[in-house]
Amino acid sequence: MQNDQGEIVDVYIPRKCSATNNILAAKDHASVQINMAEIDPQTGRMTGKQITYALCGELRRMGEADDSVNRLAMKDKMLSEVFGH
């Protein structure tokens, strides 16, 4: 398919799980997408930076979603390292 500038683009780009890197199937109704916003410590307001994490249903079913979000947030410096220990 071509866009209005004549560039070839894909119609569908599948999402991947941020923790396991598995492709999220269309029928994976247990998968979720979480947006985390950075907060300014002085004002308590959002700075405008946000990161999106997609988690597959298999990860949630195993009960590993919370650990995965914490690990991803620490890697992206959205959560302090002290929280992990």
Curated annotation (Swiss-Prot):
Protein's cellular compartments: Cytoplasm, Cytosol; Cytoplasm; Rough endoplasmic reticulum
The keyword Ribosomal protein belongs to this UniProt entry's keyword annotation: yes
Entry keyword Transmembrane: no
InterPro entries for this protein: Ribosomal_eS21, Ribosomal_eS21_CS, Ribosomal_eS21_sf
GO molecular function, one term: structural constituent of ribosome
Single GO cellular component term: ribosome
One BP annotation, GO: translation
Keywords assigned by UniProt, alphabetized: Cytoplasm, Endoplasmic reticulum, Ribonucleoprotein, Ribosomal protein
Family note: Belongs to the eukaryotic ribosomal protein eS21 family.
UniProt cross-references to PANTHER family, sorted A to Z: 40S RIBOSOMAL PROTEIN S21
Subunit structure and binding partners: Component of the 40S small ribosomal subunit.
Protein name, UniProt field: Small ribosomal subunit protein eS21
Organism: Pectinaria gouldii
Native organism taxonomy: Eukaryota, Metazoa, Spiralia, Lophotrochozoa, Annelida
